[in-house]
Design a protein with these regions (language model features):
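Generic structural signal for hydrophobic
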Residues: 5, 35, 54-58
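Conserved NAD(P)H cofactor-binding loop of Rossmann-fold oxidoreductase domains
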Residues: 46
Length: 237
């Protein structure tokens, strides 16, 4: 994000990293409590464990926030919604525009093929901590919503094991971790006679950095509230 921000004309005032990894020509602090600089907003790719400190900093300084971290609990989501009553927050599980379109296509296919069996497989590098990925959960949500509109009840099944028959409406979600794979998400719809697969593969994290910078430019001009990729894509950024 730092390199792409500089290349796109966005000045990075400082960074926050408890381990202070990497080399930058701006200050890097181990805590938000140490930050002295003023900025137009914050871009966050970190961990759910940093949420409380992050929200406290942004709210107390009236700073817009791009929240691109995944793995939040329901309690975390409630905290984010409460903070969004005070500041503008852009929250998404994936900042890539192509992933956004991937999810939209999934919803359309799920609606048209509501009687097909659906399975989701996500693959990431061996250092990714949360499973399933936020994007895989977004894929399930897209399928579930599209099918509920047709009166079909869906249920997520995380990693199949044991002896059990697949139930109608089940959506399997499977996670693979290995090597340095940036990220791949595949959704397949099966019938007795055919199948259709929709896949998104990320080859570089530049994809997500550019999307986060677009989200930053978008959110700093907004009033308080909770925003998503739907809002950003409507602006044709």
């Amino acid at each position: 994000v730092y390199e792409r921000a500089k290349e796109s004309g966005v000045n990075v005032a400082c960074g926050v990293d408890k381990l202070k990894r990497g080399f930058f020509d701006c200050p890097v602090y181990s805590s938000f409590d140490e930050v002295k600089e003023y900025a137009d907003g914050v871009i966050d790719f970190s961990s759910p464990t940093a949420l409380d400190e992050l929200l406290r900093f942004c709210v107390s300084n009236s700073m817009p926030l791009v929240l691109a971290t995944t793995g939040f609990s329901e309690e975390d989501d409630e905290k984010i919604s409460e903070a969004a009553k005070l500041i503008p927050i852009f929250k998404c599980s994936n900042t890539s525009k192509s992933v956004y379109l991937f999810l939209k296509i999934l919803g359309e296919v799920a609606e048209k093929l509501s009687d097909y069996d659906a399975e989701i497989i996500e693959r990431h590098h061996n250092l990714k901590k949360d499973a399933p990925s936020g994007t895989a959960l977004s894929a399930y949500n897209a399928i579930e919503k599209a099918r509920s509109d047709k009166g079909v009840i869906s249920e997520a099944v995380f990693g199949r094991k044991g002896l059990s028959k697949r139930k109608k409406g089940d959506v399997g979600i499977h996670s693979v971790r290995g090597g340095s794979l940036v990220g791949e998400h595949e959704a397949t719809f099966y019938s007795q006679y055919d199948s259709i697969s929709i896949t998104h593969t990320a080859y570089s994290k530049v994809l997500f950095a550019d999307g986060a910078i677009d989200a930053f430019r978008f959110i700093i001009a907004k009033e308080k509230g909770l925003y998503s990729m739907d809002d950003l894509m409507r602006t044709n950024v």
